[in-house]
Structure formats: C-alpha cells, structure tokens
C-alpha cells in the first residue's frame, strides 16, 4: 500500500504542477497583433472620429482582435462579466441624444477616450495597472477596427 501511495504521488504531483502553471498562464495579457491587411489603410496621422464605424469588414477584423486581446477582461462578444468596464456602455449616452450633431460630437469624444485608454492603458488610484497599454502593438487600423466591433455590438444589443 505504501508503494502505491508513493507511485501515485509521483504521477499526480507533476500533473498538478503542470495544471497549476497552466492556470496561472490563463491570465496572459500579452498583446496580440491584429491582422488589418484586408482593411483600407488610414495612414500615420491619427484620425478621429473612427473612420471604420459601420464598416462590416472592419467589424469582422475587430471581432477577431477583440477576442484575442479584450474578451478575457471585457467579456466574450463584448458582454461584460463584471471584471472590467462594459465597453458597450461607452456609446449609450451618445446614442440616446436626439440631436445628430450632439450625437456625433459625443461619439467623437468616446472614440478619443477609447483610443487613449487602449494605447496607454489605465491605472487605478494606487498606481496599479488595471489595463495594459497596447500602443506598442496596435496600429491605428487595429484600434478603430476593435472600436467598430464594439460599436456594432452596442447597436445590436440596443436593437438598432
């Protein structure tokens, strides 16, 4: 019986070690580049508002970029699980405005906010990073494609 227990320990111990290391690796926040080669290039100069809003090809590219870089914290299909802010709420106030001029100005502000946080990350009041910055990895096309995806999900959830 004693030998069986040692044998079991020799088998189960390394297995548990591998599983625990895998669990720790699950929280990987390494930015993954987004393939935007199918999109029209925007250029080096940052453009606001999002030039890809409503562009179906950009939405598809953004969906893949979102899945690989954002879903772990912000939720699958942009449906927040409560870990990080609900990105679909970014544009809700804008979409509720009656004036199209005010709505456009509000959406432009939301785009700037999204771009700045995406590129530079976010820290809490204690200086701890609560979101990594993707400025070293994401192109302008990637940022706007992901925002186009989030915008499309917002409209879809609102039934528009």
Which residue stretches match the model-derived regions?
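Classic N-terminal secretory signal peptides
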Residues: 12-18
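N-terminal signal peptide c-region/cleavage motif recognized by signal peptidases
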Residues: 20-22
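Axial heme c-ligation environment in periplasmic c-type cytochrome domains
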Residues: 25-32, 52, 81-90, 117-154, ...
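Short pre-active-site segment immediately N-terminal to redox-active cysteine/selenocysteine motifs
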Residues: 58, 66-72, 77, 91, ...
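Gly/Gly-Pro-rich "capping" loops immediately C-terminal to redox-active cysteine motifs
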Residues: 59-63, 79-119, 137-138
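Primarily secretory-pathway and cell-envelope proteins
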Residues: 73, 105-108, 146
